[in-house]
Regions:
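TRNA-recognition modules of translation machinery and tRNA-sensing kinases, especially anticodon-binding
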Residues: 1-367, 372-420
Length: 420
């Protein structure tokens, strides 16, 4: 067991790490284009933060959090999602007092105790953005546009954007009462989970994946059909802005998201990859969360989160290849101790000039050194032996053409800079 990673975790080895670097750097690039800056928060927070933000009745809080009491008697939780920690940090550091809106992005590991499956791990990696300080639908449109541009630029073409309005406290109270009345009349056909949800958070019943529930609740009332005039105006303007940017979308009345803090806009982005559909992103507006966590009143917010594991799996399913940028430029083959000693100055000169270079550390034969050079896909091999040392030269071999050139050691760096 000591040599096995814990269930639900996965090592990211060099054969995959470059793919992670690619999507992480692309996310940073796109966020920068939209004016978002990076935020880093601790990997663990006080448990109460997630109970108050994510919601006591959610599956995350009730079933999935990694929580413990530390040696100081504090209740601590490894973060199950990124938003709560960023909002907490904004309050603590008074970022809301800076130029509004405050636009942030993050890349972070998260932790949930759930059944591991393809694209879903107990330790997973979340990319996300949070924009605080504006309650306008134009910001909602920007957030969705950022996500769409990111997915498009990593190669996902067949995207489906689904949006919904989950109302505000004003219209939701009346709707929840109506929904609960409807669900009470259907109690005998609800699954066990929905029976619990109908009393604690009735709107979550809409999110049930149980086929029997879906069949028996086909006439369930939806929030978007009962929103107040303010929410309706907000939702209509959002749609106008998305159309202006040529972002295709559908209104999906069943989107409620799994977290309690969402208000007004909720959205998901689905990739129709080969053979199946995959939700690659979800988010929404969380007006009131800042105040709920102890911040000032009236600081609105919106954001989204996406799972890196699921994104990379979706890209793989779409046959999107990511080129490995890490290739060794030079391997130095040395013959004899004196040549090996001489190679270290050359290695330093090459690396100082940002030319990647390696040499042998296992005292291999010349043949084995060439074989290793080929294995690491070195572009050029430099050979230094007794003859070369006597003439202060080296043999430069182009590994793709097998062309060999004798060149002065003092000129080799400049020569390689011109060739690479």
């Amino acid at each position: 067991m000591l040599t096995k990673a814990p269930r639900g975790t996965k090592d990211i080895t060099p054969k995959d790490a470059y793919k992670w670097n690619y999507v992480e750097n692309k996310f940073r690039e796109i966020c920068s284009l939209f004016g978002y800056e990076e935020m880093r928060t601790p990997v663990f927070e006080h448990t109460e933060l997630f109970k108050r933000s994510v919601g006591d009745t959610t599956d995350i809080v009730q079933k999935e959090m990694y929580s413990f009491t530390d040696k100081g008697g504090r209740d601590i939780t490894l973060k199950p999602e990124g938003t709560a920690g960023v909002v907490r940090a904004c309050i603590e550091n008074k970022l809301y007092a800076d130029t509004q809106p405050t636009k942030l992005f993050y890349i972070t590991p998260c932790f949930r105790y759930e059944r591991p499956q393809a694209g879903r791990q107990r330790q997973f990696h979340q990319f996300g953005i949070e924009a605080l300080g504006s309650d306008k639908p134009s910001l909602d449109a920007e957030v969705i546009a950022l996500a769409v541009q990111f997915f498009t630029e990593v190669g996902l073409k067949d995207l489906a954007v689904s949006i919904n309005s989950v109302g505000c406290p004003t219209c939701r109270a009346e709707y929840n009462a109506r929904l609960k009345e409807y669900l009470d009349a259907k109690s005998d056909v609800l699954c066990e989970t929905c029976l619990e949800r109908k009393d604690k958070n009735p709107m979550r019943v809409i999110d049930c994946k149980n086929p029997t529930c879906k069949e028996n609740l086909n006439d369930i009332p939806f929030m978007v059909d009962h929103i107040c005039d303010d929410c309706k105006d907000h939702f209509e303007k959002l749609q106008t802005y998305l159309k202006e940017m040529d972002i295709n979308f559908v209104v999906d009345k069943t989107i409620v998201r799994g977290l309690d803090y969402y208000k007004k806009t909720a959205f998901e982005i689905i990739s129709n990859d080969i053979g199946s559909q995959s939700t690659v992103c979800g988010g929404g507006r969380y007006d009131g969360l800042v105040e709920q966590l102890g911040g000032p009143k009236g600081v609105s917010g919106i954001g989204f989160g996406l799972g890196a594991e699921r994104l990379l799996l979706t890209m793989e399913n779409n046959n999107i290849e990511i080129e490995n940028p890490y290739a060794t430029d030079i391997f130095i083959v040395t013959i004899g101790d004196e040549a090996k000693t001489k190679s270290f100055k050359l290695l330093k000169d090459l690396r100082t000039n940002h030319i990647s270079a390696e040499n042998d550390h296992l005292d291999r034969s010349v043949k084995a050194q060439f074989k290793y050079s080929d294995k690491i896909n070195a572009k050029f091999t430099i050979v230094i032996g007794d003859d070369e040392l006597a003439n202060d030269t080296a043999t430069l071999k182009n590994m793709s053409t097998s062309e060999q050139t004798t060149i002065k050691l003092s000129e080799i760096v400049q020569e390689l800079k011109s060739r690479l």
